Amino acid sequence: MSAPETWRFETKQIHSGAAPDPVTKARATPIYQTTSYVFDSADHAANLFALAEFGNIYTRIQNPTQDVLEQRLAALEGGTGALVLASGQAASTFAVLNIAQAGDHIVSSSSIYGGTYNLFKYTLAKLGIEVTFVENQDDPEEWRRALRPNTKLFFAETIGNPQINILDIRTVADVAHQGGVPLIVDNTIATPYLIRPFEHGADIVVHSVTKFLGGHGTTIGGAIIDGGSFEWSKNVERFPGLTEPDPSYHGASYTAAVGDPLAYIIKARVQLLRDLGSAIAPQSAWNLIQGIETLSLRIERHVQNAQEIAEWLDGRDDVASVNYSGLPSSPWYAKANEYAPKGVGAVLSFELKGGVEAGREFVNSLSLFSHLANIGDVRSLVIHPASTTHAQLTPEQQLTAGVTPGLVRLSVGIENVDDLKADLDEALAAARRVSEAARA
């Protein structure tokens, strides 16, 4: 049998982490609907709790179904380990809290999902963690100027939501590493099929597995994947939570116990997940595994449809601008070809010439596109970010994040593209009538 490390992406998305059940011989991954697990002996129990060996203790911390999902995500991203959580928001929260605490500072791009912006700006502030937002993530000097002695990490999205801008991962990673901190990236829109951030210098990847990885709009989940390359033990003073004895875990030092490649992800599991409890249900983990098994097939169709619709919208007189890095007119077109040669995903946004009222009429007039707060479904979706996903932000913060009053965001599904165009055409006609009436 070929070695798993030699498998291509399409094989890994089906087989990594899974094997026939040793007792029942069932081929599909079972749903292990249990709270806890029998120890072989007192010594076995003690070893598990002391991190002397790995295994299942309690489903709040780990579950065999969850483990298959984690191994598969780690394989697809090329990481050393993964932790799956109850939501993408939990993943972003854990990714920061795992190495930052009261009195610390983080640096983030401002071109991020509105929920993440709100988490960083307001909730982390209540916990004593300060954030500096980089308004132009393409400027390495702005990242460099934001560094402080108490900075613990850089954060950005590989493909920004909703600007669909491409992060120069290598450049930002270099600035982060020169400052002694890791780069954490959200790879939700791209998925590892389009961009593998570890190959470009990123250290930690987070996902809303809810979106394109799960792909069917049925299940909430999040994930953190550790690239295993950041040398925590060489930054003892900056990351004492990983390098010094943890009094809440038998005085263990995570870097000493499991080494730099696994210290971050093990700490997130046995300390944060143990204490905060954002565990994913076994049924949810199983649902997400089913989605991942068709990831490459779906993403190819998603990208094909999105590219065609972006080009179609870009050629229309009633559309003021289109944000999609797969268009030659995009300022990130060159970076898209460098980092995402197979395509830049299925999320795009555009501004109607009629402004906010035209945008509202457009959304209300669609029938095939579903008006809801999600992306990454096989079904095509639409939303008005300024009044929904980014509504918690001030008008100034919205503009910094690339959200204008009349912006409309599409998540393009895998339906027939001509049917999607017909639906968009009818809605654009309705929006045009509103604009003409306003001018009359």
Name each model feature, range by range.
Residues 277, 299, 307, 311-408, ...:
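Conserved C-terminal alpha-helix-loop-beta "cap" of PLP-dependent enzymes
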Residues 2-3, 13-22, 82-315, 323:
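Conserved PLP-enzyme active-site core in the AAT-like
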Residues 41-93, 115-123:
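Conserved N-terminal alpha-helix of the aminotransferase class I/II PLP-enzyme fold
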Residues 54, 80, 284, 288, ...:
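Short amphipathic alpha-helical segments
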Residues 36, 227-230, 352-355:
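Short loop segments at secondary-structure junctions
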Residues 2-63, 71-72:
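N-terminal "arm"/small-domain region of PLP-dependent enzymes with the aminotransferase-like
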Residues 39, 138-142, 330-331:
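A short acidic, often aromatic-flanked loop/helix-cap motif at beta-alpha or helix-coil junctions
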Residues 2, 121-122, 130-131, 152, ...:
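PLP-dependent enzyme catalytic core of the Aspartate aminotransferase-like
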